[in-house]
Amino acid sequence: MQNDPALDQLCINTIRTLSMDAVQKANSGHPGTPMALAPVAYHLWQNHLRYDPDEPLWPNRDRFVLSVGHASMLLYSLLHLANVKAVDDGGKPTNGPAVSLDDIEHFRQLGSKTPGHPEYRMTTGVETTTGPLGQGLGNSVGMAMAARWYESHFNQPDAPLFDYRVYALCGDGDMMEGISHEAASLAGHLKLSNLIWIYDSNRVTIEGHTDLAYSDDVESRFRGYNWHTLHVNDANDAAALEAAFVEAKSITDRPTLIVVHSIIGWGAPHKQDTSAAHGEPLGVEEVALAKKAYGWPEDKFFYVPDGVHERFAAGFGARGKAAREDWQAKYDAYNKKHPELAREFAQIEAHELPAGWDSDIPTFDADPKGVASRDSSGKVLNAIAARVPWMIGGAADLAPSTKTNLKFEGAGSFEHDNYGGCNLHFGIREHAMGAAVNGLALSNLRPFGSTFLIFSDYMKPPIRLSAIMEVPAIYVFTHDSIGVGEDGPTHQPIEQLASLRGVPGLTVLRPGDANEVAEAWRAALADPRRPSCIVVSRQPLPTLDRSRYAAASGTQRGAYVLADAAGGQKPHVILMATGSELSVCVDVYEKLKSEGIAARVVSMPSWDIFERQDEAYQDSVLPPDVDARVAVEQAASLGWDRYVGRLGAQVVMHTFGASAPLAELKKKFGFTPEHVYEAAKQQIERVKSKRSQE
């Protein structure tokens, strides 16, 4: 490709004007950052990013993460000008564009492919959903970890299949967020030299210049994280940008941060370098003045001059196509020389699991003393991961407690000298862990992350994003209730279950015994487009005798009749529970049965799976004509009224817990068979009284 600075500048200004016009027409959005970063993104894409626009899901492509998601028009403009093809639901390229000019004209409109912040799956070329600042940085660390795992697992001396890089574009807001510290620290420790962050230091936020609230020496901070740092004083300096990108790619022992100083809203004479350029349209007059400053026709909107598409095709497109074709030839040869590895990789790409992946999941014998569900979860996890090589994960420094350490032969630890390890050590960085797990899932691995349920609050943003993106992240949350005991209310989750259940598209499973744990893991692995939380206990739970009670396979339907009235009688009362409280309901059921009272126990490990069942099944489990109902759960009451009705009883937590042995806490808060029995009897009497008055 011939050197042509004038044509390069034309491309840069096209990005700027498309961004201004789109925000102005939508009457909402963020024009300033795309205007500032257009030269940075252009030179990265045109000269360095390895990406074939005709095959946008090519496995060895470089990943570009727009962590500064409010600058979405920057990405949409690039995708349009680079003529990136859209892919169909099966991931195959189509003849249509990922982003058309019409899509840009409908920026931020209902049903468009150009939403206000980039959304994974909605727009081809968007590698991850961003918007909440800092999340893209955490995702990029997970993506870089995945790249290293692919290299370690699949590369052969005669066939180095994988060597892609991950670039993330971030801003002052990203750097202020705590997750950037966690993610950068982890990446530096792991020496992820395939990771390059480009930090737009424009020193302007919504409230004004950053000196109001931010005075960090970012480069010193990152050197302390074991990062290589580079500095570009002017975002419009093409030679300095080129030198920085070349040097960053040459670093082999640590990640790189490139600090770029830009002027937000560059070219807008009255609004550049002010907060007015950040999160609102510039205004018709200011847009015209900015276009005049660029030498642009002031009366043309959504204008792409001749030669711009061709310039992208000659650089970005031609480079990417050549790299992808070279890789495809290597892969074809690899397929012949290493067919088993090639088949494994094909399964990963197809979002499949190996045949027999669940064949070693144990069945647990009845045991009144039982086992903590965190322990049974650890056994099931190891049985699955030993058969699914791309199932990797770890904990926020809690693997010995959450029982998520993979112990099978060859599992190993993922470290800078062993990127093929399956055990990820996230350190005490829950927020970064959640975001990195998303990055791993976006790379088609089947990852998990674990901590105590109480600390799920530290990672709520990435959990929410995993549901928005429909990626199969698995979160293992242990120490799930006041069962934590003496650690007291700071460590006893109360409202966390309700919060997680409130996330659309997130499967929350709280199994009641070891065999339900096994089924919970089956459910979590079954859907490659749904994240899951497996919530388990610290304390032992009795393993129910499945010869007397229903099979745990009912877990797959979210809720099921565990024990029922004899002879098909209509139950006088329904006892429903999750987790550690299930065995309490079984004890009460047996007492009622001994008194000749027809009762039913419903295990409800997953409300959202149950809600996806047909109405006939739901009514068969919870008959509408049975009003006497008792719900038992060591958590907040929110949501249970849906199942017990307005007059049903709830044995739940209405306050925070306390520091004491579990046996005392059960008595204090009413989670004993005696208390639940009384609640059941009161419900039966309430219904009798109501009927006598009818």
Describe each region flagged by the PLM:
Residues 65-67, 194-201, 476-477:
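Short internal beta-strands
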Residues 37-189, 405, 440:
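Cofactor-binding active-site loop characterized by glycine-rich and histidine/acidic residues
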Residues 14-28, 200-202:
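N-terminal capping segment at the start of a domain
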Residues 5, 22-31, 59-68, 122-134, ...:
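A short glycine/serine-rich beta->alpha loop
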Residues 18-23, 53-61, 115-129, 161-167, ...:
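Glycine/charged-rich beta-loop-alpha catalytic/anionic-binding loops adjacent to active sites
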Residues 3-17, 49-51, 98-122, 400-415, ...:
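Acidic-glycine-rich active-site phosphate/pyrophosphate-binding loop
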Residues 100, 106-129, 145, 149-163, ...:
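Thiamine diphosphate
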